[in-house]
Amino acid sequence: MIQPQTHLNVADNSGARKLMCIRIIGASNRRYAHIGDVIVAVIKEAVPHMSLEKSEVVRAVIVRTCKELKRDCGMIIRYDDNAAIVIDQKGNPKGSRVFGAIPEELRQFGFTKILSIAPEVL
C-alpha cells in the first residue's frame, strides 16, 4: 500500500535510485496505490550523468510492495521492499533493464513491455 510521501526503490536502469510518491493517478481522492497502479513521483536520489536527475517529476508503475498480494488461487505474495519502474506517458519503461522479480498481475494492466524485459516473472 503506497500513499503520498512513501519512498520507493527503482527497479530499472533509468538513472533514478529512489522515488517519493506525490500523487496516485486514477481516482480523485484515492488513498492507497497497489501493484500495477501508476503514480506521480519525484526523484529523491539519482545516478550522476544519466538522463533522469534529482528533483525531477516522473510517472512510475508500482511493481513490488511490502503489503501482501492475494491471488485468486489462494497464493499470497509478499516482497521485501516497495519498488517502482519509471515509465513515459505511453506506459513504456524509460530503462532498458529491470531488476528483481515482477508479478504476473502487470499483464492485465497493459504493461507487457515491462514483463518482456523482466528477468523473473512470478
Swiss-Prot record:
CDD domains: Ribosomal_uL14. InterPro entries: Ribosomal_uL14, Ribosomal_uL14_bac-type, Ribosomal_uL14_sf. It is found in: Plastid, Chloroplast. It holds the Pfam family Ribosomal_L14. Keywords: Chloroplast, Plastid, Ribonucleoprotein, Ribosomal protein, RNA-binding, rRNA-binding. Disulfide bonds: none annotated. GO terms for biological process: translation. GO terms for cellular component: chloroplast; cytosolic large ribosomal subunit. SMART domains: Ribosomal_L14. Its main location: plastid. One of its GO terms (molecular function) is large ribosomal subunit rRNA binding. Belongs to the universal ribosomal protein uL14 family. PANTHER family: 50S/60S RIBOSOMAL PROTEIN L14/L23, LARGE RIBOSOMAL SUBUNIT PROTEIN UL14M. Part of the 50S ribosomal subunit. Binds to 23S rRNA. This is Large ribosomal subunit protein uL14c. The gene is rpl14.
